[in-house]
UniProtKB/Swiss-Prot annotation:
InterPro entries: Ald_DH/histidinol_DH, Histidinol_DH_CS, Histidinol_DH_monofunct, Hstdl_DH. It is an enzyme of class 1 (oxidoreductase). One of its GO terms (biological process) is L-histidine biosynthetic process. The keyword Membrane does not apply. The lineage of its organism: Bacteria, Pseudomonadati, Spirochaetota, Spirochaetia, Leptospirales. The gene is hisD. This is Histidinol dehydrogenase.
Length: 427
């Protein structure tokens, strides 16, 4: 059994509700484990970080946790460099259109405006674990640079006491200032509080395992750092009709399963025929492409689903309830169907837009809200690293004209003696 097919309607709560509630993981038990680690790094700095690096990453800690990128000259395959440079260019070009304008307006003779100012220091977490993610470095650093962040560092676990040149090259191409070789909750704590050797950051972004997420949530709750949306397992929801290629749909489901055993891969369709063909293609692919096979199979068996609804409208209703990290729309009228999307991290339209294009090269960001957080969070972007500062310049004439309203409002709130007076004396 690779992936199950369910013929459902929106009222089939016993089948759909557990899926909708997926990965809204209770972090309380993880927070209990993470809190003492974070506090220990806060109190003992580099010494604690060395102990946890050896314990959790199972490597001899590096002599220095910090690599200044300007001093590094990574040697990588020319093809990898070309791909990283191309990806960086596309990411940069797409994110440039997100840079907001400072605006102003005149209301009753008063000038009011918006000024966008960047966060000053940011850390971008690049996971270690089961894969290397130079693409995540590009996705995190480039929008921060465009926003005007002056101090950007990568935080990532060391591999055998050092880092692959591919990660260093990505950091250099993206424009980061330094790399901090520390992972997990201890790495997040180090860049949040700072240590003897590691500068602190005001804001931390990027995906990671549950310990990284718990550390970010804890430190954010303590007011130490700002964070992007809390990260959970990777996920894709595909809406497809009978115009979709079942082999391609199956490949897209499996590309998500390749991330990890807890990854979520769902197909919603109005075609039972497509559902059956996709199921066959998934099983066939698991046999033909055995690399990371156990991981993919467990992901598909535990978290993979094919839902056959009576019509596409119900597919979109379910998708908006699910609020997927990645949403693929492989339908005849995919451009029209885009208007039905309310909640999704990133949308991939048509048969030629697999998630992997956005993961690596097209230019959109792959640091996305998961576990239904797309209902309230957006993808990482330039605005993630900007603050909106409002300003006003009030005229004497406006003071005279608007004071009566200030008087009424301040008296109603019981604050006229000082609030009202501060306007009254300027008339």
């Amino acid at each position: 059994m690779a992936i199950q097919i369910f013929k459902v309607g929106l009222k089939d709560h016993s089948v759909l509700d557990p899926v909708l509630k997926r990965a809204r993981e209770d972090l309380s038990s993880t927070l209990a484990l993470v809190k003492p680690i974070v506090e220990d790094v806060k109190n003992r700095g580099d010494s604690a970080l060395r102990e946890y690096t050896q314990k959790f990453d199972e490597v001899i800690p590096p002599k220095s946790f910090v690599l200044e990128i300007s001093k590094l000259n990574p040697k990588i395959d020319p093809k990898l460099k070309t791909a990283l440079v191309k990806a960086a260019k596309n990411i940069r070009n797409f994110h440039k259109i997100q840079i907001p304008e400072n605006k102003e307006i005149i209301i009753h003779g008063n000038k009011l405006g918006i000024l966008h100012t960047p966060i000053e220091s940011v850390s971008v977490y690049a996971p270690g674990g089961k894969a290397l993610y130079p693409s995540t470095i590009l996705m995190g650093v480039i929008p921060a640079k465009l926003a005007g962040v002056k101090n950007i560092q990568i935080v990532t676990p060391p591999r055998k006491g050092t880092l692959p040149d591919g990660l260093i090259a990505a950091a250099k191409i993206a424009g980061a200032d330094r790399i901090v070789m520390a992972g997990g909750a201890q790495g997040i704590a180090a860049v949040s509080y700072g240590t003897e050797s590691i500068p602190s950051s005001e804001f931390v972004v990027g995906p990671g395992n549950k310990f990284v997420t718990a550390a970010k949530v804890y430190l954010s709750g303590q007011g130490v750092i700002g964070i992007d949306s809390p990260a959970g397992p990777s996920e894709v929801l595909i809406i497809a009709d009978d115009s979709a290629d079942p082999m391609w749909v199956a490949a897209d489901l499996l590309s998500q399963a390749e991330h990890g055993e807890d990854s979520v891969a769902i197909l919603c369709t109005n075609s039972l025929s497509l559902a059956q063909k996709v199921k066959e293609e998934v099983e066939k692919a698991l046999i033909e492409r055995p690399k990371r096979g156990e991981m993919k199979r467990k992901s598909i068996e535990d978290h993979g689903k094919i839902f056959v609804f009576s019509n596409l409208e119900e597919c979109f209703v379910f998708s908006n309830l699910f609020a997927p990290e990645h949403l693929e729309i492989q339908t005849k009228n995919f451009k029209k169907d885009l208007k039905k999307v309310k909640h999704a991290g990133s949308v991939f339209l048509g048969n030629y837009s697999p998630v992997a294009m956005g993961d690596y090269i097209s230019g959109t960001n792959h640091i996305l809200p998961t576990a239904g957080a797309a209902r309230i969070y957006s993808s990482l972007g330039v605005s993630t690293f900007l603050k909106r500062v409002t300003w006003q310049e009030v005229s004497k004439k406006s003071i005279q004209n608007l004071y009566p309203h200030v008087k009424v409002l301040s008296e109603f709130e019981g604050l006229d003696e000082e609030h009202g007076n501060s306007v009254r004396i300027r008339r």
